[in-house]
Amino acid sequence: AVVDRPMAARPLHEMWRRTDHPLVDRWIGRHDVVWGPNFVSPPTRAAELMTVHDLTAVNFPELANEFTLAFPGMIRRALRRGAWVHTVSEFVRDEVIEHFGADPDRVVAVHLGVRSAPPGRPDRGAALAGGNRYVLALGTVEPRKDLPTLVRAFDRLADRDRDLRLVVAGADGWGADALGAAVAASPQRARIVRLGRVDDRDRAALLAGAAAYAFPSIYEGFGLPPIEAMSAGVPVVATRAGALPEVCGDGADLVPVGDAEALAAALHRIVDDDGHRSDLVERGKRVAAAYDWDVTADRLADLLVRVAGTRG
């Protein structure tokens, strides 16, 4: 049986940063394993498994907020208690082993999955974008996503393509002012659309109508949005950041981090070269098809059984 027990995360995190108490056992009764699916492994007398999605707080502390900066210390404490680690990519697995000195036999990579969304309406996407041709970026606006570089790339691209627009859809996270400043300084700001958070219907519509999908991140432990775009048949340009080469494979065009010129060139090739675009769409669909949530769930279930068996 699985018990999903929501708790007051922040107060407990503050305590678990400093001590291995209180034990989570007091709230959930008898159990074989506790799984913390988002960096935090609650202390327990049973076996522990924690999911580590990335090491932003270690590699790029300037790109992490105060809450996530606490994660490395909590990971170390859990490892000292004997916790197992699930990572969402082989890249992060290697990082966890190297940075924390974790036992390789107790750090297991299981990729995330993607479910194909119902087809969106391109006409709805065009209405949201204010035009039929647009480059799309989806997700929370925060420094790690490096959207100002995308704005600079679009400035170059828009000079060569007068009909193209840039659409950024996602809620403002911390540090979102940098994107606002980049848009305000852009000579192409009239063709840049910021939509804020969108619901699933509008997300699907935006993907259905997009000429290209851009993912210019500085660092990623997995990178689900480009896989979702590939699954929807949208050609993707991403950066060679963190796990993205592993996850995207040959299903995306990859460019160096922070290189607006290279990003603009890759996007231009997609919107200008129909043959390349079609080839990239087909490769992207093949890559995305490998990320199946049912397979992920089976592998995680096997891992939980394995972890539970380590405590008598």
Regions found by a protein language model. Name each.
Residues 1-312:
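Carbohydrate transferase catalytic cores enriched for Leloir-type hexosyltransferases
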